[in-house]
Amino acid sequence: MAITIQMKLNEQLYLKDPQDTRLGRKIIQHSILLIDEIGFEAFTFKKLADQIGSTEASVYRYFTNKHLLLVYLLCWYWEWMKFSIDYNTMNIEDARKKLRIAISSIVDTTRRNTSIEFVDEDVLHRIVVAEATKAYHTKEVDKENRDGFFMTYKVLSKKISDIITEIDPNYPYPRALASTLLEMANNHIYFALHLPALTDITVEGGDLSQVEKLLEDFAFGLLNIELK
């Protein structure tokens, strides 16, 4: 049975929260599918409207432009990842175990959760891998950062960095390591699929176990902790 999970996202990203209406959820569902199919550059609100049997104007009632829609989708994904880490580390005392769970969640969040009917996290993850940098490698990034567009990503990264500090309070680069783990997961999946000479891992049949192993080796190696 499908359930409704309401993600609290920055209100400046949208004109009307798409999670609140059937049409809005349909916009989210099909924008994910369409961006995955044709890419963000080719994606337009007109093409989306045609796909959902609505009008371009109806999409503009929710989002000012497709850039904000992309940021919204990424924030939804990052918030879902944070929820996954929170849930899976609940009542865990061993910080090393928490970091392994967090790393697993970074990878596992990419897998489809059939309980959320309007978001296919597996497809959304492909968008994160291929398109995420287009959300914040822009001329407007400083203003958008001041407006809190990327707070969800920063909170997620801080959660991981706090676990790293819990393991080793003297480690000097917890924030850098946390953000690197998040980016590394996406980068090496992309490399494995499209630029294999840039990575040592392979991704076949949706098996991301090598990605998880890479993140563990990298993180625990820098923290001088032997994996068992």
Question: What is each of the regions a protein language model found here?
Answer:
Residues 1-10, 154, 158-169, 179-228:
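C-terminal peripheral helix-coil segments that are non-catalytic and often amphipathic
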Residues 8-19:
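Short, Lys/Arg-enriched N-terminal segment that forms or immediately precedes the first helix
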Residues 14, 22-44:
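Short, amphipathic alpha-helix enriched in basic
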Residues 29-33, 68-90, 101-105:
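Alpha-helical structural segments
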Residues 41-68:
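Helix-turn-helix
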Residues 72, 88-122, 178-181:
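Hydrophobic alpha-helical connector segments
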Residues 80, 84, 113, 131, ...:
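A short secondary-structure junction motif
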Residues 97, 124-166:
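Amphipathic alpha-helical packing segments from all-alpha helical-bundle domains
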